[in-house]
Amino acid sequence: MSAPRRSTSLRDSSSDSERMEGTGSWDDALDWFKLEHPASRSVSHHANYKCLLEAERVLVEGRGVVLINTDEAGTLIVTNFRLIFLSEGTENIIALGTIPLATIEKFSKMVVKNQSAPRHSEKTPSQRFLQVIGKDMRIVVFGFRSKTKQRRAIYDGLLRCTKPSRLWDLYAFSCGPFKFTNANPKVRLLNEYFRLLGKGLCRASMDMIDNGSYTMSNELWRICNVNSNYIMCPSYPFALIVPKSISDEEVIQASNFRSKGRLPVVSWCHPETGAVLARSSQPLVGLMMNMRSNTDEKLVAELCSQLGDEKKRRRKLYIADARPRKNALANVAMGGGSESSSNYFQSEVVFFGIDNIHSMRESLSRLRDYLDAHGTTSSDGTLSLLRHGGWTWGGGNLSNMSASVSTLGDSGWLIHVQSVLAGSAWIAARVALESASVLVHCSDGWDRTSQLVALANLLLDPYYRTFTGFQALIEKDWLAFGHPFAERGGMPTVSGSSGRPPDLCRQSSVGSFPLPPMCQSSGSFAPPTPSSSHAQNQQSPIFLQWIDCVSQLLRMYPFAFEFSSAFLVDLLDCVLSCRFGNFFCNSEKERQQVGISEACGCLWAYLADLRSSEGRSHVHCNPFYSPLKHNGPLLPPAAALAPTLWPQFHLRWACPSEAQAGELEAQCRIMSIKFSKLQKAKEGAEKKAKETAIVVESLSAELRNEKQLSSSAMALAKRASKETAAIKRAIQSLGCKVHYASGGDTTVDIETSPVKNSQKSVFSPSTRESVGIVQHEDKSDLSVSISVAADDVVSNNPFGRVCDTLCPLRTRDGGCRWPDAGCAQLASQFIGVKADYEALDSLSIYEGYFKTVSTL
């Protein structure tokens, strides 16, 4: 039974004065809970919801819950995959209140005391709230009735499911591959290596990996299998591209001089100039910064192959250290540090000054708080225009407006994004314009290094701006090269430990929730001290920040990318939700150990399946994409790298109406859909026209055949008419009267004057029938039947045989000269003229015949 619908809106029940003081929203929320609603259901009585995915099970269900952000009542459900909020009555999913469990960063129980209660009351009533903070920039608050166990049930369900102790407790393992099967990513990595080496026609296979026959090479580089068992470097892929002149033994020696064994290897090579983009971790120069490795220096020097000019000069090498210089020096205490340009031939060391993972995590948290405080759907249920004494953007206090803008700047997120963009653009320019090689590293070479290298690849190679290439880029520079997705996302690893502190997911962070004066936290665990949480927490939105950088490039170069901003948002949602296994664990080695590709569904197959339904008109496809317009490197100037908030991601929860910033893109997509429909209609019309033309041609051919047959029949008819006229003249020359039968057939009756006794034909009835003779009932002294007979019938005619044997007018070779010979040919085309000679004796002659003869 659904909860009764409210008659009063939360925002309408309070006075304007209460809103001005900033406490009206909470008092409004309290009024609604005076209505009675059923308590949460037990697990055994859950409804069969249509919104559930494959293998998704309902664990906890609570009715009569309010989503404070939008003032909506409904049902809150905890499944083994999501926290789902369904609208009251219709049971439609409310997107803001529905969040995958893995996307939840933290949640906490909140208590709000009712300020409208009488002062003399002994006990002030309070209401129960649950705050949920997501990694996808949302902060939502759910309200529960007091004196019920709904909030406790939901809270305990989240507590059990948001932090699984084992990797295989994640929903992706329960669901399995389903219809989104995943091939082994090692095969795809080798195919990308083959493309980089100019061996794109070769295709990798698992048999090739098993027997080690994938070690191909070109003039400068080769694929090395020294790490095939992940012993040399557990966080590197099984195959590496290294200089062809470096042996496997030297590769192993060089790995000992780099942090975590992450030696310099090739990530991308220019197909024409030979310049490369390489990556590694920091060198282990020691406390005195005087440690060196001849093998490492040789390996780095081989990255600078000779230029293709006449002077055979060696190209320059840039060593790009992503860290601030002071951070690099601080790592000396732990044996790390940075290279000295004096030790590496023709090299230059450059520091980019990008902050560490902790700075990025705190920056995104501040940005999320800013958006929640100044968005249109706030987590305390009020509009940003009604906060802080009632000032508004249109006519409020300018100092307050400036303060809010300053808060956005204080978050530092856009500054960090610009740092990554600027560093990547600088790297791409060195490779494209100077034909120089660049070696990029940070401390461990898997966070800032992955950002810079992958973004520089995107700028340099148009292939990576397609759907297929973008997948290959992420699988190469993020997954294969060991970005620790489990630690950065707070998910369990192969060993079963989670990368986030045990208590962090259960507590409210300071400043993340704008609490009114009477609001208190009732979490079961005390929040950890800032120092301890900062040291232990390895979560950081590194990959999210890189996707943000890609969206900035997409904004600057709308014609250069095959995919759209909506594709990037869906990609991020899939990564954060852990619905698929592609981004599990911390390295390729761990994913191979668990068998992720066989046990879990594939994110890339899922996204491709979404696009297949609509083709190029799908929202993931960029309608402006023009591959010929940007078929080379993208080299943005520094002035163009000023980033902005990414509306489709940053504003979609706090400012839903403003998140649809791509109106032009949407209109273009609509026009593209219409054009596609018209194109299909045109193709259909052309197809029908071709079919009609074929039918017309066929009918024309039949008509021509009919005309030929008609012409032939007409010719035969004329010929027969001439022959008939000749026969008529021949008969009339005997002085006989010719009479045609009225039947219209080929039989012609010739009659003379009547006699008393009719004569019978000399032929028997059967003979007369065979030659077409018809006996008429009309009595006459002579009856002659004329019919047209076939040649085979004529051949059996005895008169014909007589004609053939006795005719004196035939040629020497036996040919007949009729009608030129002037004979009455019996076996001619006039065969069938049969005479009754007995009747001929009694033939009557017209009297006028003799008069004519005498006159002549």
Predicted regions and their residues:
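Conserved N-terminal structural segment that caps and organizes enzyme catalytic cores in eukaryotes
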Residues: S2-S7, S15-E18, N69, G97, ...
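Well-ordered beta-strand positions
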Residues: L76-I77, I133, C269-P271, A432
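A phosphate-binding catalytic loop at a beta-strand-loop-alpha-helix junction
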Residues: A278, V431, A436-L458, V550
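Conserved hydrolase catalytic core segment
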Residues: D461
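Functionally constrained cores in energy, signaling, and assembly domains
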Residues: A55, G62, A320, K326, ...
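Anionic N-terminal interaction surfaces
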Residues: S2-V78
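Phosphoinositide-binding peripheral membrane targeting modules
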Residues: K50-F129, I133-K135, I139-R145
